[in-house]
Amino acid sequence: MDAYLLLDFGSTYTKLTAVDIENEGILATAKDITTIESDIMVGFNKAYEKLTEQLEGKEVNFVKKLACSSAAGGLKMIAIGLVPELTAEAAKRAALGAGARVLNVYSYDLTNKEVEEIKNSNLDIILLAGGTDGGNKECMIHNAKMLAEHGVKLPIVVAGNKVVSDEVSEIFDKAGIFYRVTENVMPKLNTLNVEPAREEIRQIFMKKIVEAKGMSNAESFINGILMPTPAAVLKAARVLAEGTDKEDGIGDLIVVDIGGATTDVHSLADGEPSKPGVTLRGLEEPFAKRTVEGDLGMRYSAISLWEASGTRKLQKYLCDNTVDVEACCKYRAEHIKMVPETEEEIKFDEAMAKVATDMAMERHVGVIESMYTPMGVIYSQIGKDLLNVKCVIGTGGVLVHSKNPGEILKAGSFDMADATHLKPQHPEYYIDKTYILSAMGLLAEDLPDKAVRIMKKYLVKV
């Protein structure tokens, strides 16, 4: 039988999924520790061995082998723009949507100190924006010159004011910098245009980054490392929400991905105001939006999760005021491979997951603000209104292994005690039990209809 082999070179595990193309089913899944320090193929070969054992007795012909990766720290970027709330924020959103970890966002004219900071950062790509089309020219030219003069040699995606793109190209050509020019991330005030920059970032990731991270060994076995893992998850979520010409999507949805270091939230919805008389304010929101909370994680970021939430919030979800939450979080940060075994450990992990879901969702969704005027109260919305989203999908180890995944995801739903945050009110909850989201994002590149049908079949309602 013809099958696709879909790989995710994760930061901790290398995960393999074999998909029967004809019958639209998962044939087998396997995983092993990612071995980025030595040779990434060592961990892959161990996982592949486990996979072939499961496929014993079946005649499987892998017609395509596709991969995504977040190994070696994933795709690390910085964004540079003009105004923090506008072009710098638009650049950040483009980078996040491309599946990157955004290490920093710089605005206005770069200083010598900032450029040295950029130069010494462990980065993969710089996204340079600034000014609307026909707007401010000086800032982007200044920043391009600064990067060139300080000898920055990282790949740069230029996605700012189109009027200065020729001049910026000239600066980078003279300095021998690898760059790509694409459309402005904010061509008009408050108007987002992130897709061209996302695609350019993905192309550079495929060509340059995979090689730089010592992953070219894998390229000989597979057809290509197509994108960073978070971009694959976002792609899967998008095709599931929107559907294809031949297969209906399920409509607006949210994906919550709780990991050891971060909690990612992906929303696929236009987020327009659902209540009458509310006006939108601020930067336009993308239909496919991703936010990453680097301080909300189950292991690496356990201490920062406690610092961000405070003792009281964790104790609220634990329903126990006697637990030393600081000590429990510190232990997890120091023992990142810890697997909870006792009832107390499981309860504490689930309380952490609830805090991560609650806070990550709070930061992702829009807010309603009231303003008093002589005409009465006026309500404005900043960000996305996700009140009416009917589907929330959870993924990540703590959710997959939990006996109460629905309770964890409920922590991210609308709360009357905090009615200004526009979290989903009455959604249905699903779990990605077989870790297929990133795999389906890869499959959707070739066979989107099948990817949608497989997700509908394998996502488990809780």
From Swiss-Prot:
Name used for this protein in its record: Protein MutL
Domain of life: Bacteria
Reported function: May play a role in glutamate fermentation.
InterPro entries, A to Z: MutL
Pfam families: MutL (PF13941)
